[in-house]
């Protein structure tokens, strides 16, 4: 009822305010904020009282929620675009570990002038308060009522309360100005880290994985920015307060005060040691946190292959190992923090006891004014005494974070960001005319270059390599010497000399692992060049990698890639890349969201979108790294004729890396690399004359090229792609952005859930259920109240001591009992903190374990609809909140409310009439917290949610660094990141503004409480001792009012992190659980593993009317699919790219469940087989090769099931023995994520094949297993497969028809349907069969036909 009245009242107020603000100017910001910050145009009084925040408070209260468009824009001075400029001129070239922190002090401290002034007033009022209290207690102590002037008493009360109010206002303004400064540091550092991420070299990326960078941006930047809130000023301020208050103490109690000060000084080194220990364990915990986050990121990014290999448990155990070490160091950090806290509490009392004992033993009388003034001074001293070690701890804890950020900012960058590299590429070599290669102007010329992936020992390579020829010769000798001395220098390419003619098509080919990708990376400055020169490389380059980089955005946005939309060019690009049919089949046409890394597209579709992006960019130079291997022959021919050789690229410089040698004769220039990295170059005719027999390589008599009489492309017979483009109008592929139905269909990513309203009791109950029983929790909470009650007894005992209430007792009696009371308090304090530590530690441990298992066992649909950055946010920031912050917050909330409760009871016990003002204040307190909490809670929730886009973009850009840099799109992504950071900082900014709003009002309420208590005690309480005690108690409670409500909201905020984690723990699991918490817990419809011991033993596969949908309301990807595979049969699956071939593989592994129909293996419905059993029973060589962080051995045999001999035998079968033997540590060589530091793309495919050969599977599925391998190696691997898999049922998905030509049967898939299924010979005998056309479209037609006839 009371709440309804409040809402009705404030609703009227809100309408009045809306009328006043109708003409309020709107912001031009492009983000979701819609109004300028009210602080900019507010009066001085409004700024001091924070009245400018009131409207936002009212909105949150009346709506019980806040949306993004309710939040004001960030002030221009605090936006990242402004603050990041302060770090632009930082010089990190020296070896000092403190360069960054010095620069921050230099640039940001001048902005803190208002905070410094506010802090000065805090010091002044802190010093004056005890003096005013001394005068007031002196007045109270006057025994003769006739000597007391009521007016004087009132004036003394007002003077005391004025000091209290002045200190409170100064404190709030100090926090506000200080936090704004730290806030600026946070934004500037986050911006700098992202800018650096976009420049990282390949060598730096080995050390700095995306997970580690996320931790640096979230945890380390937060540590640094929090230090610059107030701690950097408080270190000096608190020291000054301690000295001034100790001086005042000496004034009150004489030299006895120095004894207490001495005790305090003696304890400080112990505090410092404990702080250092705690900081040391914090640094270690951050290292393990980095490792854990990196592994988690790897798991989430590669979740599909992990599931297909049934390796979830293996990687969960790997992550758990890092988590255990992280938790161990977190516990030790908290333990030493507890000891430090105990020392502070003990020290504060020992200082008081030693001072009073010395004062009494020296013959002085303990009077009220001395006792309670000293108590107040000690109370005032307690704050800097507690906070100074904490400030020092923050400063010490800052060091590892500063080092981590600084080391990251100092890490090596891609060479293209070096001005020497830029200058070199912009000039043509002056000695070109003396070179026997005779390059023309604007040709790309590489002279005497040595390229390597790893960072050289002397990473200032430009100073080494630029100069005259004599210096270069000396450099060559130096390099060769180093190579002999250090086996870690593994040069992939040495002494490279080549020309890429301008405006021509240059093809690069060679055996797998010969260095083709390394060569093009060297051209664009992505690997290290130790000597020689590269010139003529255009500034404007389009690039496609073997693993296409796709944004989590619409298909159109991926093609445009930041360029303006030109509809005519866009249409031509879609037709040239054969995307028309694919786009028309998508639910939202070209506006369809394609998911992170193109997760809902086939490999061929992803490659064609990457090609379309390159084509649309209209660059001067195009570099394609094996784009044609991912598509079928028909599409490959179309892409070559209409894209690579088409009108949009005509007369442009094109470099094509390919194993598709049927296109070699059409090249203007050819570069052939052998296995030693040596190259031969020339035209097709010149290379034939040099002995390069392409005819023997291609195994065909049909390959010819007559340069003078090249066949005109317009005379070629139209293939099916061209017919499709004529039938399907390209306009049908372009969607209307204003069509709401289409936009809804186009969406893939789900909106991140935001909790609404108050945190319910059940949420707290659920949280504590992870950490303890109800009994343990009850005991812990009770001990907080019991402890504070005992502590309050010690204050009453001081009053008894002062008044000598017990006759005939000496000072030692009072001191003894005082120490006994305090000793009891210390014991209870230790027990309650250790119990709470144990509870929060167990919560963190159990919660992360549950989260990891839940996410790992979630369906693939979950990963399709949630970007990896959003998921990782649960494992980084949210987990950090639970691990680190919850213990501190719960401790402070418990202490605050137990202190408030016991303190208020004490005041009412002494002054019963105080019940009336306290009831009035309680009502006001209730109203304030009701107004404040909704806005504070919602702003903090938005702050948590708006972190996810930052992490998602960081993860995405990290994965696509090469593409982003090559297309020179850094500025676009920096702008997007700056907008994301500003949105997040905006929530953070107004969250603190709301805190200050309520704190200011609560401080005023506290001032009112102090005023009434001191006034009533002064005028109406006859017992002078109790009167003095009530005043000092009211003074001590003043800060608890605002502190308590702020910490309550902080608790709700951290509970929001818990709720976000809990929501992921409760997500549906895929199919039948892989691992149950109870091993006997099996679905009633699931077949137990015990009944499938030897399954499958025949390998018979049957699809019965199978229908597969990736989205509930989308068109089926497989339609009414039915076929049967007999035991040991070899089935080849072919079809146009995007036809549904890989979906067949996914359905066999139940990566996506059948919406209709059945899949049977040896007569058993696989939907009733537990996923762990199903997936571990089928071998897979995936379309995208999968290498995880670890050794070569662990990648081949993660469970240590095989001997060295067996592993080497399988390695030799896949032709990787020489490559692995050339590595320093052989099988123990460490590979980074994706294996980029050790293997080429083709070699990674062979490594995946090695895993499958090693295990004895009855059913094996190969999805484009040799697509990126040269023809010769592919033939050897084909023979290996035939020998090792002869007794296995094999399904082979391939675009190279020679790969599947020996299969027993061929399944031809088109648009998700099985259109042909028969033996190769039978299908060849049908003139118009799809398979017949595919065979004839291949270069190796005669050889394939002969193979079929022989069979």
Curated annotation (Swiss-Prot):
Q: Which InterPro entries match?
A: AAA+_ATPase, ABC1_TM_dom, ABC1_TM_sf, ABC_transporter-like_ATP-bd, ABC_transporter-like_CS, ABC_transporter_C-like, ABCC_6TM_D1, ABCC_6TM_D2
Q: Where does ATP bind?
A: 510-517, 1135-1142
Q: List the Gene Ontology MF annotations in alphabetical order.
A: ABC-type transporter activity; ATP binding; ATP hydrolysis activity; ATPase-coupled transmembrane transporter activity
Against PROSITE patterns, the record matches this protein to: ABC_TM1F, ABC_TRANSPORTER_1, ABC_TRANSPORTER_2
Q: Does the keyword 4Fe-4S apply?
A: no
Give the location in the cell: Membrane
Where is the organism placed in the taxonomic lineage, from the top?
Eukaryota, Amoebozoa, Evosea, Eumycetozoa, Dictyostelia
Q: Which family does it belong to?
A: Belongs to the ABC transporter superfamily. ABCC family. Conjugate transporter (TC 3.A.1.208) subfamily.
Example GO BP: transmembrane transport
Which domain of life does the protein's organism represent? Eukaryota
Native species of this protein? Dictyostelium discoideum
- Cross-referenced Gene3D superfamilies, in alphabetical order? ABC transporter type 1, transmembrane domain, P-loop containing nucleotide triphosphate hydrolases
Recorded topology in the membrane = Multi-pass membrane protein
All residue ranges annotated as the ABC transmembrane type-1 domain in the record: 112-397, 777-1060
Q: Which UniProt keywords apply?
A: ATP-binding, Coiled coil, Membrane, Nucleotide-binding, Repeat, Transmembrane, Transmembrane helix, Transport
What is the protein name stated in its UniProt record?
ABC transporter C family member 6
Q: What PANTHER family does the record point to?
A: ABC TRANSPORTER C FAMILY MEMBER 1-RELATED (PTHR24223:SF172), ATP-BINDING CASSETTE SUB-FAMILY C (PTHR24223)
Q: What is its main location?
A: membrane
- State a GO cellular component annotated for this protein: membrane
| Domain ABC transporter per the UniProt entry, residue ranges | 474-700, 1101-1336
Its transmembrane ranges are: 120-140, 149-169, 248-268, 771-791, 815-835, 904-924, 977-999, 1002-1022, 1025-1045
Coiled-coil annotation: which residues?
701-734
């Amino acid at each position: 009822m009371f709440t309804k009245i409040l809402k009705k009242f404030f609703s009227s107020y809100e309408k009045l305010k809306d009328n006043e603000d109708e003409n309020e100017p709107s912001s031009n910001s492009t983000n979701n904020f819609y109004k300028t910050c009210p602080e900019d145009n507010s009066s001085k009084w409004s700024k001091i009282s924070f009245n400018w925040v009131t409207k936002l408070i009212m909105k949150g209260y009346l709506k019980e929620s806040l949306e993004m468009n309710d939040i004001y824009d960030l002030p221009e001075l605090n936006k990242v675009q402004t603050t990041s400029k302060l770090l632009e001129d930082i010089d990190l070239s020296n070896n000092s570990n403190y360069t960054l922190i010095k620069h921050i002090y230099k640039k940001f401290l001048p902005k803190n002038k208002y905070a410094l002034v506010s802090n000065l007033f805090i010091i002044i009022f802190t010093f004056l308060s005890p003096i005013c209290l001394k005068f007031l207690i002196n007045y109270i102590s006057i025994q003769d009522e006739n000597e007391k002037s009521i007016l004087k008493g009132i004036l003394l009360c007002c003077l005391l309360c004025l000091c209290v109010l002045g200190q409170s206002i100064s404190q709030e303004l100090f926090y506000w100005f200080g936090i704004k400064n730290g806030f600026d540091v946070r934004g500037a550092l986050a911006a700098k880290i992202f800018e650096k991420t976009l420049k990282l070299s390949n060598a730096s990326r080995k050390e700095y994985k995306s997970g580690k960078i996320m931790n640096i941006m979230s945890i380390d930047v937060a540590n640094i920015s929090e230090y610059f809130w107030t701690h950097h000023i408080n270190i000096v301020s608190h020291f000054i307060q301690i000295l001034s208050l100790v001086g005042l103490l000496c004034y009150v109690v004489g030299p006895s005060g120095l004894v207490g000060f001495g005790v305090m000084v003696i304890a400080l080194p112990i505090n410092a040691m404990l702080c250092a220990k705690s900081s040391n364990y914090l640094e270690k915990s951050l290292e393990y946190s980095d490792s854990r986050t990196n592994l988690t990121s790897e798991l989430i990014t590669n979740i599909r292959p992990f599931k297909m290999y049934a390796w979830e448990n293996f990687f969960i155990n790997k992550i758990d190992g890092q988590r255990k070490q992280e938790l161990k160091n977190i516990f030790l950090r908290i333990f030493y923090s507890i000891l430090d806290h105990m020392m502070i509490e003990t020290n504060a009392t020992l200082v008081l006891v030693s001072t009073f004992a010395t004062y009494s033993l020296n013959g002085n009388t303990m009077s009220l004014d001395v006792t309670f003034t000293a108590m107040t001074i000690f109370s005032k001293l307690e704050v800097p005494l507690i906070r100074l070690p904490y400030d020092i701890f923050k400063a010490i804890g800052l060091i590892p974070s500063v080092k981590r950020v600084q080391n990251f900012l100092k890490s090596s960058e891609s060479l293209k960001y070096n001005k020497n590299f830029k200058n070199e590429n912009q000039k043509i070599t002056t000695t070109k005319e003396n070179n026997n290669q005779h390059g023309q102007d604007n040709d790309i010329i590489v002279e005497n270059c040595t390229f390597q992936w790893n960072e050289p020992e002397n990473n200032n390579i430009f100073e080494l390599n630029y100069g005259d020829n004599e210096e270069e010769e000396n450099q060559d000798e130096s390099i060769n010497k180093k190579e002999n001395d250090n086996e870690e220098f593994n040069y992939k390419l040495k002494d490279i000399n080549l020309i890429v003619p301008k405006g021509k098509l240059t093809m690069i080919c060679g055996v797998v692992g010969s260095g083709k990708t390394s060569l093009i990376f060297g051209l664009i400055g992505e690997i290290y060049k130790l000597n020689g020169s590269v010139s003529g490389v255009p500034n404007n380059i389009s690039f496609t990698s073997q693993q296409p980089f796709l944004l989590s955005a619409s298909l159109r946005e991926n093609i445009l890639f930041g360029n303006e939309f030109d509809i005519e060019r866009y249409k031509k690009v879609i037709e040239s890349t054969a995307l028309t049919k694919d786009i028309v089949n998508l639910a939202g046409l070209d506006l369809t969201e394609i998911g992170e890394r193109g997760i809902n597209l086939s490999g061929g579709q992803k490659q064609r979108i990457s090609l379309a992006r390159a084509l649309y960019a209209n660059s001067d130079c195009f570099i394609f790294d094996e784009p044609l291997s991912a598509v079928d022959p028909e599409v490959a021919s179309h892409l070559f004729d209409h894209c690579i050789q088409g009108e949009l690229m005509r007369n442009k410089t094109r470099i094509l890396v390919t194993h598709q040698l049927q296109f070699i004769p059409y090249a203007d220039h050819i570069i052939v690399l052998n296995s030693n990295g040596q190259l031969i170059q020339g035209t097709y005719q010149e290379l034939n004359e040099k002995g390069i027999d392409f005819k023997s390589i291609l195994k065909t008599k049909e390959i010819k090229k007559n340069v003078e009489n090249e066949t005109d492309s317009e005379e070629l017979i139209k293939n099916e792609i061209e017919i499709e483009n004529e039938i399907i109008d390209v306009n049908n592929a372009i969607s209307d952005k204003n069509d709401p139905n289409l936009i809804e269909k186009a969406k893939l990513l789900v909106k991140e859930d935001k909790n609404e309203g108050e945190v319910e009791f059940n949420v707290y109950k659920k949280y504590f259920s992870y950490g303890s029983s109800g009994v343990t929790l009850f005991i812990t909470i009770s001990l907080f109240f019991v402890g504070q009650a005992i502590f309050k007894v010690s204050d009453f005992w001081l009053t008894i001591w002062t008044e000598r209430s017990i006759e005939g007792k000496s000072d030692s009696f009072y001191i003894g009992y005082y120490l006994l009371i305090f000793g009891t308090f210390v014991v209870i304090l230790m027990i309650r903190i250790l119990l709470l530590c144990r509870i929060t530690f167990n919560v963190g441990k159990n919660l992360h374990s549950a989260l990891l298992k839940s996410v790992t066992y979630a369906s693939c649909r979950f990963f399709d609809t949630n970007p990896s950055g959003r998921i990782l946010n649960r494992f980084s920031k949210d987990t950090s909140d639970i691990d680190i912050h919850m213990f501190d917050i719960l401790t402070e909330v418990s202490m605050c409310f137990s202190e408030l409760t016991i303190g208020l009871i004490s005041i009412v016990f002494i002054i019963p009439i105080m019940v009336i003002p306290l009831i009035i204040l309680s009502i006001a307190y209730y109203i304030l917290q009701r107004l404040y909490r909704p806005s504070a809670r919602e702003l903090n929730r938005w702050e948590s949610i708006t972190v996810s886009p930052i992490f998602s973009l960081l993860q995405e850009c990290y994965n696509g660094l090469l593409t982003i840099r090559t297309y020179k799109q850094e500025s676009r992504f920096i702008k997007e990141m700056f907008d994301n950071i500003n949105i997040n900082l905006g929530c953070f900014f107004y969250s603190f503004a709301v805190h200050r709003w309520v704190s200011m009002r609560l401080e005023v309420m506290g001032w009112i409480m102090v005023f009434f208590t001191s006034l009533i005690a002064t005028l109406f309480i006859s017992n002078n001792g109790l009167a003095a005690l009530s005043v000092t108690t009211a003074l001590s409670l003043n800060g608890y009012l605002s502190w308590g409500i702020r910490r309550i909201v902080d608790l709700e905020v951290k509970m929001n992190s818990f709720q976000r984690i809990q929501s992921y723990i409760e997500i549906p699991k895929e199919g039948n659980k892989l691992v149950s918490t109870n091993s006997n817990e099996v679905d009633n419809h699931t077949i137990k593993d015990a009944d499938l011991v030897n399954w499958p033993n025949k390998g018979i596969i049957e699809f019965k009317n199978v229908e597969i949908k990736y989205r509930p309301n989308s068109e089926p990807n497989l339609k009414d699919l039915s076929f049967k595979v007999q035991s040991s049969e070899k089935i080849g699956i072919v079809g146009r790219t995007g036809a549904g071939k890989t979906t067949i593989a996914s359905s066999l592994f139940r990566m996506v469940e059948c919406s209709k129909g059945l899949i049977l293996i040896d007569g058993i419905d696989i939907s009733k087989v537990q996923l762990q059993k199903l997936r571990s029973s089928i071998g897979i060589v995936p379309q995208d090769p999968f290498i995880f962080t670890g050794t070569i051995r662990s990648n081949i045999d993660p469970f240590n099931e095989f001997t060295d001999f067996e592993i080497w035998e399988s390695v030799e079968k896949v032709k990787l023995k020489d490559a692995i033997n050339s590595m320093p540590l052989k099988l123990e060589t460490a590979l980074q994520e994706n294996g980029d530091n050790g293997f080429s793309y083709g070699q990674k495919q062979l490594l995946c094949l090695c895993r499958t050969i090693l295990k004895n599977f009855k059913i094996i599925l190969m999805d484009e297993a040799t697509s990126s391998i040269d023809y010769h190696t592919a033939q050897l691997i084909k023979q290996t497969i035939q020998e090792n898999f002869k007794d296995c049922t094999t399904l082979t998905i391939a675009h190279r028809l020679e790969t599947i030509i020996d299969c027993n049967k061929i399944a031809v898939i088109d648009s998700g349907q099985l259109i042909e299924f028969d033996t190769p010979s039978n299908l060849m005998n049908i003139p118009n069969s799809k398979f017949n056309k595919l065979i004839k479209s291949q270069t190796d037609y005669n050889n394939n036909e002969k193979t079929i006839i022989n069979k």
